[in-house]
């Protein structure tokens, strides 16, 4: 497994980075595309950091003929918005996405873009949440649980 740190904010730089990767390593077997933004000051930045970055990445891969065997896109369950809050039944693939955040909308736009592509090998994963550098929300949740603090996630209290 190798990691590629790419600049999605500059299309020309991204293309140069991918060309360099191709020279040094050849093509890709698989790409796990988990880059993106989860917090932004301006709602438009979600589209830039999630949808447009993904789209430019894929367009550049296609232009440079660097398609992987499989492109794994890390999306989010947030594309569904608040769903099944009463009975908590599982979300399924046939459910209609109804994102209620700019983040969820940007992830859904990326999924819709992928679904429109012809002959592009992709799969979409929708994790419940992410945790890593600069993403502290889930750490706070786990810390609350470890201290036996009751908390609720969601948009309203259900009795």
Regions inferred by a protein language model and the residue ranges of each:
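NAD(P)H-binding glycine-rich loop region in Rossmannoid oxidoreductase-like domains
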Residues: 8-51, 55-56, 82
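Active-site YXXXK catalytic motif of short-chain dehydrogenase/reductase
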Residues: 50, 92, 103-107
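Short, glycine/charged-enriched secondary-structure capping and boundary segments
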Residues: 17-19, 45-48, 85-90, 137-140, ...
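Conserved Rossmann-fold NAD(P)-dependent oxidoreductase catalytic core, especially the SDR/UDP-sugar
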Residues: 56-102, 123
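NAD(P)-dependent short-chain dehydrogenase/reductase
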Residues: 117-159
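Conserved sequence/active-site signature of Rossmann-fold short-chain dehydrogenase/reductase
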Residues: 9, 79, 130-132
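Active-site Tyr-X1-5-Lys
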Residues: 98-123
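Cofactor-binding loops of NAD(P)H-dependent oxidoreductases
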Residues: 4-6
């Amino acid at each position: 497994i190798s990691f590629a740190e790419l600049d999605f904010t500059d299309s020309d730089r991204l293309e140069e980075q991918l060309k360099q990767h191709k020279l040094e390593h050849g093509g890709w077997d698989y790409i796990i595309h988990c880059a993106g933004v989860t917090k932004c000051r301006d709602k438009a930045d979600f589209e830039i950091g999630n949808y447009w970055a993904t789209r430019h990445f894929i367009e550049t891969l296609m232009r440079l003929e660097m398609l992987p065997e499989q492109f794994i896109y890390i999306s989010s369950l947030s594309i569904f918005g608040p769903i099944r809050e009463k009975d908590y039944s599982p979300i399924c693939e046939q459910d209609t996405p109804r994102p209620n955040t700019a983040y969820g909308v940007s992830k859904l736009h990326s999924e819709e873009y992928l679904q429109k592509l012809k002959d592009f090998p992709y799969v979409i994963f929708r994790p419940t949440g992410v945790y890593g550098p600069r993403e502290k929300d889930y750490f706070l949740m786990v810390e609350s649980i470890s201290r036996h603090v009751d908390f609720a996630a969601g948009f309203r209290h259900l009795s």
